Design a protein with these regions (language model features):
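Hydrophobic alpha-helical positions that pack around
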Residues: 41-149, 155-162, 170-171
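Major-groove recognition helix of helix-turn-helix-like DNA-binding domains
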Residues: 166
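A structural-propensity feature for long, helix-poor, extended segments
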Residues: 175-178
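Metallocofactor- and cofactor-centric catalytic cores in central/energy metabolism, strongly enriched
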Residues: 12-18, 34-37, 43
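Short connector loops at secondary-structure junctions
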Residues: 6-7, 30-34, 41-45
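Gly-rich Lys/Arg/Thr-decorated short loops/hinges at beta-loop-alpha junctions or inter-strand turns
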Residues: 1-13, 134
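Histidine-anchored nucleotide/phosphate-binding helix
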Residues: 18-34
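Cofactor-cradling patches in redox/metallo enzymes
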Residues: 14-22, 46-47, 146
Length: 178
């Protein structure tokens, strides 16, 4: 489980890990049920010690789940780097994670798996971080899939000054909308 969230300024995974760790672990348990010989590894960067401590406490009784504390460095959350950090296996550009015997899912994906299997709820929303110097009230919001950017900015109190750039995703790997 990719809990690295290595993109600067993004905090949605961090909040989910703090507020709903049981759902994250529940989703991972469902995945492990489908692959009985597999081992679950929850990878979290060391700049989130509160999350690491909480997850370690919650997985203590689980024989097939561990929490791996990663050094905080970019791009630690990149799939290939995460696999190498967790397993020591190298995944080159022509390979898929499955070629290394791995599945990498992020915090929101395993939470969505839990919600779908446990409660029959489809993925209808996601947590997004709205931040930056131009944002009136930087915050994380759970919003419906497909919400307009203008509505999202309105929820954050609008802009306090003109934005020089709007990026969808993180500043390193995201896409500049303008």
């Amino acid at each position: 489980v990719n809990g690295a969230e290595c993109e600067p300024y993004l905090t949605s995974d961090y909040r989910r890990m703090l507020e709903e760790p049981e759902k994250v672990i529940g989703g991972l348990k469902i995945m492990l049920h489908m692959f009985p010989r597999a081992k679950g590894v929850i990878c979290i960067e060391d700049n989130k010690p509160d999350c690491i401590a909480k997850f370690r406490e919650l997985v203590l009784p689980e024989d097939n789940i561990e929490v791996l504390e990663l050094k905080t460095k970019y791009p630690q959350g990149a799939e290939r780097m995460l696999i190498y950090a967790a397993t020591g296996r190298k995944v080159n550009s022509s390979m898929l994670p499955a070629d290394a015997g791995c599945i990498v899912d992020n915090i929101d994906t395993v939470t969505a798996i839990y919600q779908a299997v446990r409660f029959g709820e489809p993925l209808m929303s996601r947590i997004v971080t709205v931040t930056g110097d131009a944002v009136q009230n930087p915050c994380n919001f759970e919003v419906p899939v497909g919400m307009l950017l203008s509505e999202l900015l309105e929820q954050a109190g609008g802009l306090k000054n003109e934005a020089s750039k709007i990026i969808c995703g993180g500043p390193m790997m995201g896409k500049a909308l303008f």
